[in-house]
């Protein structure tokens, strides 16, 4: 089920209208048939047959939401990796999907580009868009995710909060490395009141401060 649609029985056009996909490599997403970022975002909207006024409105909204207005007249292939990935996301977001699926969108980006993309994801969730992301950067998952799907060999192992997932005792056997903060908390046996290990630094500092342990 995606956005209330049974993908086994629903027409593909309906499913693709409800769910947008952003690939791991932005070079695979950018069409290359347009010369500017503005035109690239317009490409999908034009194929949808939307009125000109609606196309312009959606492009303007996407430029602001993805914070790429300053590069709207540049060629997408002249941008940094983080900027190019934001353009790829903008092109999909402009089509107003209910669900946005991101396939390891930061795997080929440097730390700055990765931070840019995660900030964008945070803004999109505030706009009411459901985000499903395949990602291996555990610190980022701990910081930004509301819920985590833990898979092993394509089988669902657990679906819970980042705290609950990273507090599991079987992570090593599943090949999952918890965030550094959680690993330290486990080593020190510092748990929160709910029995879970903290996943963010400020939480661990708070636990240490409660016991008067120096932590600066």
Label each PLM-derived region with a short phrase.
Residues 135-136:
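H-loop/switch region of ABC-family ATPase nucleotide-binding domains
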Residues 42, 46, 53-71:
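Conserved ABC ATPase "signature" region
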Residues 1-14:
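ABC ATPase NBD Q-loop/coupling interface
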Residues 75-79, 83:
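Conserved ABC ATPase signature
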Residues 100-103:
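Catalytic Walker B motif of ABC-type/P-loop ATPase nucleotide-binding domains
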Residues 153-154:
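Conserved ABC ATPase "signature" C-loop
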Residues 167-216:
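ABC ATPase nucleotide-binding domains
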